[in-house]
Structure formats: structure tokens, C-alpha cells
Amino acid sequence: ASDVYKRQLKDRTEAVRLLDWFLTQLAERQLPVFAISGNHDSADRIAFGAALLQNSRVYVSPVFTGAPVPIPLTDEYGTLDVYLLPFLKPAMVRHVWPDEPVETYNDALACVLRHCPPDPAHRSVLVAHQFVAGAACCESEEVSVGGVDSVDASLFDAFDYVALGHLHSPQKVGRDTVRYCGTPLKYSFSEARQHKSACFVELGPKGEVSITTAPLTPKHDLREVRGSYMELTDRRRYADTAVDDYLHITLTDEQDVPDALARLRVIYPNLMRLDYDNLRTREDQQITAPERAESITPLEHFSAFYQLQNNQPLTAAQAAFCQQLIEEIWKEGEDA
């Protein structure tokens, strides 16, 4: 359910080779594979060779040109239809159906799904890549201001199972059968407390779906460690720990330890980040933490800024004008 690649990668050669090896291993075992492009992917690049790959039962979503066509599979319970829906923006949907009232991401997804209702007599699986309202995010992910890119989980009600990509934490949204698989590894320290897993879904007769998960344990975990320099360099404390893990260490010493990073790396070679938590740093952080960006609308952000600059709130007319500008700018960005 993607992302297949991460946009920030400067050299994707290794990633491309790894994907090639992985798909080949699955195809050699006669296992069908379904893949879509995400918001960090180039849909055109992911779709390259899609028609040829189908001969090996590797099904890749084409560039979005309209409602997805179901890919039928058959087993002892009958037909199972798989729908591949790559990452969508409202402008992409307006281009296909210009007469449809599509302004938001929710409108866009609702429009597409109206044009591909699943056969109620068949079991159906949707593979998609969108942010579903109510799902938990972390710092590794791009979060839009005001949650403007979110979609409602109820749009998926007609499908027996929905396999979602986009968010890094494995989780269900709305119901057990609408799930983000999450990432196989932790990509930032905001994910340190997440438990990565693989999700196994078995679709029996129509309406019967069983889900089990298996933990994914990496060779080196990503962890946060806290304590004084003396505590963290005490052999009795670290002797039985995984010192080769990727670590974010927070020292609680009131005085900075000279050359602490290099000295700690003698014990913890994969130390990636070092911070202090003491009276000095807490005083530096007395500014009240802002609310999460996705809980505040663009107009609320601008209104707060205007209040700070002018010592008075926006008038109703000013607020209405600002909201109109925001909507026009957002629409222009989607059409770009």
C-alpha cells in the first residue's frame, strides 16, 4: 500500500535493487502481489512495466485515469476482487470527472468509490494510500494544517477489507478491517515506542475476516535512553542491554559533560542523538508547546498571527475574505 520509495532518498539504486529482488522472490513462489503508488512515489515510474508484470502475477496500479478495475482472484469460497487505488489528490479526480463536486480529499475519494462499487456477491479488498481521519500520526510523517487531506473511514464500508498505506504506525481505523500495516522499521525517534508488526489477513466466506499479527524485531532497535552520565557508563547498567541499538540518549546531569557524545559512543557505537534534560534546558523550554498543527485550521493560524501583530482580532468581514483566499490558494495548489 506504499510508499514504495521515500522521496528524500538521494540515491535510490539500492532501494530499486531491493524491490526488484523482493518482487522476484515472491513471483518465483507463485504468490500474487498487489502494489500501488503513494504520495512520495512517482506514479508513472511505479506503473512502468505494469502490463508485463501481470504475467508474473505482480499487479501494479496504473497512473490514475478513473475508477479502478477489480482484479479477480478465485478460491474455494468464490471470487475475491482486489481494487488498487493509488494516492489521490482532488485535482486528479476533477480532471477525470470535471462535473463532479470535488473540493476536498474526502470528496475525491467518495467520487472515485461511487464509480467503482464492489459487487456485493463477491468478497472485496481495497488497497489505498490516504490519511484517514482519527488515525495516529508521528513526526516521521507529513501532516497537513487543519487535517485538510483527511478522509472518512465510513467511505470504505462496502469493502470487506481495506489495506492502507501512508502512516508509519500499525493500527486499525474505524473498524478492525480497515488497517494501516505501518512500516517494517522505525524511521524516527517519535516511533521509538511503536511495536512494528506484520498483519496476516484471511478472508473466508463472504463476511468472515480473520486478522493476526506477528511482531517484527529488527537486528538493531531504535530506542530512547535516559539517565545521568555516571549511570549510563556504569557497566552494571549497560552490560545486559543491546548497546548496538540506534539510540537517542538524554542526559540528566545539571552540568554539561565535556565531549559526552564521543565518550558515550565508546559504549554505544550507534548513538544518533544526544540531549540534556536539566534546569537550564527546562527553562529554555518554558514557552507553551503549540497545539498539533492538524488540529488548527489555516484560518485559525492566520487569526492568531493577526491578533499578535495588531493587538486586535480579525473582523467578520476580514475573516470571510481570508477564508476565501485560503480556499483559492489551496485549490490552485491542488491544480498545479
Segments predicted by a language model, with ranges:
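A conserved active-site cap/scaffold subdomain adjacent to cofactor or substrate pockets
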Residues: 161, 165-216
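A short helix->loop->beta-strand "cap" motif at the edges of active sites that frequently abuts
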Residues: 26-33
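Short, small-residue-biased leader/transition segments that mark boundaries at the very start
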Residues: 1-5
